[in-house]
Swiss-Prot record:
Keywords: Glycoprotein, Glycosyltransferase, Golgi apparatus, Lipid metabolism, Membrane, Signal-anchor, Transferase, Transmembrane, Transmembrane helix
Transmembrane segments: 16-34
UniProt-listed InterPro entries: Glyco_tran_10_C (IPR055270), Glyco_tran_10_N (IPR031481), Glyco_trans_10 (IPR001503), GT10-like_C_sf (IPR038577)
This protein's record includes keyword Transmembrane helix: yes
Membrane association type: Single-pass type II membrane protein
Protein's UniProt name: 4-galactosyl-N-acetylglucosaminide 3-alpha-L-fucosyltransferase FUT5
Organism of provenance: Pan troglodytes (Chimpanzee)
Family listed: Belongs to the glycosyltransferase 10 family.
Cellular localisation: Golgi apparatus, Golgi stack membrane
Pathway(s) where this gene product acts: Protein modification; protein glycosylation
Catalytic activity: a beta-D-galactosyl-(1->3)-N-acetyl-beta-D-glucosaminyl derivative + GDP-beta-L-fucose = a beta-D-galactosyl-(1->3)-[alpha-L-fucosyl-(1->4)]-N-acetyl-beta-D-glucosaminyl derivative + GDP + H(+); an N-acetyl-alpha-neuraminyl-(2->3)-beta-D-galactosyl-(1->4)-N-acetyl-beta-D-glucosaminyl derivative + GDP-beta-L-fucose = an alpha-Neu5Ac-(2->3)-beta-D-Gal-(1->4)-[alpha-L-Fuc-(1->3)]-beta-D-GlcNAc derivative + GDP + H(+); an alpha-Neu5Ac-(2->3)-beta-D-Gal-(1->4)-beta-D-GlcNAc-(1->3)-beta-D-Gal-(1->4)-[alpha-L-Fuc-(1->3)]-beta-D-GlcNAc derivative + GDP-beta-L-fucose = an alpha-Neu5Ac-(2->3)-beta-D-Gal-(1->4)-[alpha-L-Fuc-(1->3)]-beta-D-GlcNAc-(1->3)-beta-D-Gal-(1->4)-[alpha-L-Fuc-(1->3)]-beta-D-GlcNAc derivative + GDP + H(+); a beta-D-galactosyl-(1->4)-N-acetyl-beta-D-glucosaminyl derivative + GDP-beta-L-fucose = a beta-D-galactosyl-(1->4)-[alpha-L-fucosyl-(1->3)]-N-acetyl-beta-D-glucosaminyl derivative + GDP + H(+)
Length: 374
């Protein structure tokens, strides 16, 4: 007579099953949360985030905190083993170079070597006798050595003597650990920083400033063929004087500048383009790496490459055509509507090393500078 009697055990069984399923769901959520938290703490950074870790094993507590530092950005002590080319340079705070950036204590006082978190070694200043000019071989625990050069492989001697000494590379090469190009283009918008190009002030055609002549070099041989068809004003040693104080004023009178590199290597695009040509508002005529290499750093219509012409005579004819066609000549300046050139400074390069060291604590050894750089 009791219709509910047989249904009671079934109701209890369903209730137990629901409880077990709920506990299982809670467990799955908990372990999923635990794994995500663990991955965020020790794994690769998620897209859009930067993993910032303190340098482990830094010597003698040199990561002291100051008013600009935070736990994520320790204030490191960086030693310049020599001034670049033995010439002292100003060392402003890195936060002054890039507002809001972290700071390091950067010094050329070799007495701080035992406390330094990192040592920057400028290759040119040690290359003639590396064994005698390098820092002491017994380095403090965790100290990182940075190999630094803005010269091309053709002008870097005794690279093989540096095997196993360094932890990071720093150069104009884009595949360096710390990339320090001679120049770059910075996007901008709004009113032009410079007044529009005054074409009437461009009273001369082609200039070239060269300090190391090298009669057998590719650039001198090309110039000698070019000047047979086109007048080129040459400045520098054994040529017209070009005082540093009036250099930009002089070069800005020219429509074109021969930005010919002293040696041909990937990414080796120097101040000859970034300062001598672009800062003078002259169209650079380049001889260096390939056009495609230049186009990694410049719009294709910002320069003229010698490889675009079958001969120096053809290049001369093209420059003479542009001299008479103002519209075509001015087309080489359109990129300046949205971009502006910037040139390197030693201080900014040292700050780039500071920021790299703060962001990456990984300790590595560069087995062979020579194998990588040449």
């Amino acid at each position: 007579m009791d219709p509910l009697g047989p249904a009671k055990p079934q109701w209890l069984w369903r209730r137990c099953l629901a409880g077990l399923l709920f506990q299982l769901l809670v467990a799955v959520c908990f372990f999923s949360y635990l794994r995500v938290s663990r991955d965020d703490a020790t794994g690769s950074p998620r897209p859009g985030l930067m993993a910032v870790e303190p340098v482990t094993g830094a010597p003698n507590g040199s990561r002291c905190q100051d008013s600009m530092a935070t736990p994520a950005h320790p204030t490191l002590l960086i030693l310049l083993w020599t001034w670049p080319f033995n010439t002292p340079v100003a060392l402003p705070r890195c936060s002054e170079m890039v507002p809001g950036a972290a700071d390091c204590n950067i010094t050329a006082d070799s007495n701080v070597y035992p406390q330094a978190d990192a040592v920057i070694v400028h290759h040119w200043d040690i290359m003639y006798n590396p064994s005698a000019n390098l820092p002491p071989p017994t380095r403090p625990q965790g100290q990182r050595w940075i190999w630094f050069s803005m010269e091309s492989p053709s002008n870097c001697r005794h690279l093989e003597a540096l095997d196993g000494y360094f932890n990071l590379t720093m150069s104009y090469r884009s595949d360096s650990d710390i990339f320090t190009p001679y120049g770059w283009l910075q996007p901008w918008s709004g009113q032009p920083v410079h007044p529009p190009l005054n074409l009437s002030a461009k009273t001369e055609l082609v200039a070239w400033a060269v300090s190391n002549w090298g009669p057998n070099s590719a650039r001198v041989r090309y110039y000698q063929s070019l000047q047979a068809h086109l007048k080129v004003d040459v400045y520098g040693r054994s040529h017209k004087p070009l005082p540093q104080g009036t250099m930009m004023e002089t070069l800005s009178r020219y429509k074109f500048y021969l930005a010919f590199e002293n040696s041909l290597h990937p990414d080796y695009i120097t101040e000859k383009l970034w300062r001598n040509a672009l800062e003078a508002w002259a169209v650079p005529v380049v001889l260096g790496p390939s056009r495609s290499n230049y186009e990694r750093f410049l719009p294709p219509d910002a320069f003229i490459h010698v490889d675009d012409f079958q001969s120096p005579k053809d290049l001369a004819r093209y420059l003479q055509e542009l001299d008479k066609d103002h519209a075509r000549y001015l087309s080489y300046f359109r990129w300046r509507e949205t971009l502006r050139p910037r040139s390197f400074s030693w201080a900014l390069d040292f700050c780039k090393a500071c920021w790299k060291l703060q962001q990456e604590s990984r300790y590595q050894t560069v087995r062979s500078i020579a194998a990588w750089f040449t």
